Amino acid sequence: MVSSKLSFVATAVAALAPLASAFDASSRSNLAIYWGQGPNQLRLSHFCQETSLDIINIGFINYFPDMSPGHWPGSNFGNQCDGSVYVTNDGVVTKLLSGCHQIMEDIPICQAAGKKVLLSIGGAYPPDQSILSEDSAVAFATFLWGAFGPVAEGWEGPRPFGDVVVDGFDFDIEHNGGFGYATMVNTFRQYFNQVPERKFYLSAAPQCIIPDAQLSDAIFNAAFDFIWIQYYNTAACSAKSFIDTSLGTFNFDAWVTVLKASASKDAKLYVGLPASETAANQGYYLTPDEVESLVSTYMDRYPDTFGGIMLWEATASENNQIDGAPYADHMKDILLHCDPSPPVTSSSAVPSSTPVTTPSPSSSAVPSSTPAVSETPSPSSSAVPSSTPVASSTPVVPGTSASSSPVSSSSAIAPSTPVVPGTSTPSSTPVASSTPVVPGTSASSSPVSSSSAVASSTPVVPGTSVPSSTPAIPGGSSSSSEAVASSTPLVTLTLTVSPTPAPSSSESSSTDLSSSTQTDVGTAPSQPAGPSTTATATTSSSSSSTDESSTTVGSGNGNGSGSTTTTAATDSITAAPTATSSATATGATSEPVTITTIIVTSYIDICPTGFTTVTTTYTTTYCPGTNTATATATVTNPPSGPGGAGSQTTAPTVPEGWTTTVTVCTQCAAKPTTVTLTLPVTETGSTSTDAVPAPPAATGEGSNPTQPSGASPTGGNGSFSEEPVPPPAVTQVSTSTEIVTLVRPTSSRPLILGTGTVHPSSTLAVKPSAKPSGQNSGSSSHVPIPPSYTQEAVSPLSTGAASRVTGLGHGLVLTVLTLSAFFVL
């Protein structure tokens, strides 16, 4: 499994190699963008294809050790991880995500395209972010360097992105003053100096008011490379006031003066802007024409200080299409047009054999002068390796909508990039799977369809993304749907989506959500000996409606305040089996035909720890009245949605030999839940668990600061005015250990659906969470031990997401009680 992922990344990097561009930190026309918190956001690799972007900040490390379980930092990358976290041997469930293999795969692709990827610390949620002591600041920086920096021989702590190395760290601090951040920056600098062969960067995102309550102290007392000022959501100094001076005073000049008198005097100053009208409070968005006027003025006035534009955020830009191009493309065009000496694109190519998944301190994964990324998909004439196109339905949480996502694991192209490959002949048994649906949502099931017969010579490959049904979502959505087609399917998928409810602007109220049904029909031509037979697999999944949603929303505004709204949990679940069949005709053409049908079925059952999905296979034989038959399940109880008859597509839901039962499950959700199950007469469910070791906490204890943080800096008296505490050498790590368990999220843990590619599988297994059960090795030392395997074996499904909405600083955490399902390859 790991080798296939390495091959995937290597192929993708090789595809980008011919057109990569070199990064120039001294340029005045760079474009930086935040990614990781967008609603329904696409994978990072999608944005790596955009030549307009130079720096991508991944957000966020949003839980700080002094305030986080186990004294570990915690992370949130929206819908891009599978929800797995590290658990200490004391049973403390940390907030550090461990199942982020999509990001782990995509960062090297960005770096191969000449982009710098920084890990952002902070965000608007939770509002208790703070550092309590100098020692804690040093420990925080040390932990992040060990976990996300170059792989060090002595480091035995967690590596959430595997051996992938970020290009630096960004500080987007929104709360509780600036104590300790200068110490963190100076500690990072000491670590950077230990790896002189590779360049690392530090950036900060203060709000525009001078002094910024959180970051002015760090900017004055520690050296940053980039300062991108949030010129939005603050009326007194926003970029909009450059256009309309009656609104306030655009203070770029004042910030230049501040920088020249600080330790960050050589930093490049960026203008931070919202990437769409909905990415900030009303009235702060600038049109491209307005931006061009601002950029031309200040790039010309401060050619040595002006660095470019920062955008919040990538998904907002992607959705803000102007003349067929995202907002970011227009910003890059403006920068290049205004720059009297724009960067020159290099013609050198990145060698296709360059290893990019495991960059190390001693060598850069990608040469610094690499050509630019191409946004144009190109046809491929080579046959795609034999693989079955897989589409799996995913569990749905209240207030979100899931749609089918046909994905092929052999794709080397990022989502939404169609590729026309040559013919391929995968071979496997048709399988269709479906997972439980939580009321109040709409869900679809997608067949895993293929045929043992050879497909026709002209395969059909969809070139556009699959439409998704989007019900009303209080407070926004944090799930998405993508379609990637890069292997030759043996089936033609026809997707039908029922009416789409309108989205709701309500953020905290309970909302009636109508059910919708999406039906996927897969057909595969086959040519068996004897009579012609067509195998058809049809699946459908439906959900009931509910007037309750279960969300916990943490919000913050530009001034750093936050609020939380909680509504009731859902109380009923309906699960139905899905089945596919392959039919084989026997007998001569002129004689009656006997059809043997092998049916592979997945159904939902309840085990002691929650839901489980069981896959079973059985064979039936029958004699139709003609020489041609279609092997489909019998519709014995067609569903009827809330909209009345005809509101849903008829599909087999209770085949012969099955029975429907209603029961109350006490372990399936936060409160007793009424569950409708469709089960075989004699089959029972099974469960499985997995547990792997993971590391404990980085310590951060210490006394509270004796001086207020975030005050206007005077002289050299800042949070790091004394001699910095030297960072501990990684070669002196103790050999004593403690065992930690990697835990899967359960229905009692915050969870939001994710997206991205789903790896092919012939079975679907729901794994209950492993209880915190780490054991002490007998040592008093706290040395983290990495997991015994990476999260690559788990297909990305979900995580807690933090969506940025109107009026916020950077980020909003939306947590939803739901179930988690993991596809095991």
Curated annotation (Swiss-Prot):
Keywords: Carbohydrate metabolism, Cell membrane, Cell wall, Chitin degradation, Chitin-binding, Glycoprotein, Glycosidase, GPI-anchor, Hydrolase, Lipoprotein, Membrane, Polysaccharide degradation, Secreted, Signal. Residues 338-568, 680-736, 750-792 are annotated as: Disordered. GO terms for cellular component: extracellular region; plasma membrane; side of membrane. This is Endochitinase A1. PANTHER family: ENDOCHITINASE, ENDOCHITINASE A. GO terms for biological process: chitin catabolic process; polysaccharide catabolic process. It is an enzyme of class 3 (hydrolase). Residues 701-712, 772-792 have a biased composition (Polar residues). The active site is at E174 (proton donor). The lineage of its organism: Eukaryota, Fungi, Dikarya, Ascomycota, Pezizomycotina. Residues 801-825 form a propeptide. SUPFAM superfamilies: (Trans)glycosidases. The gene is chiA1.
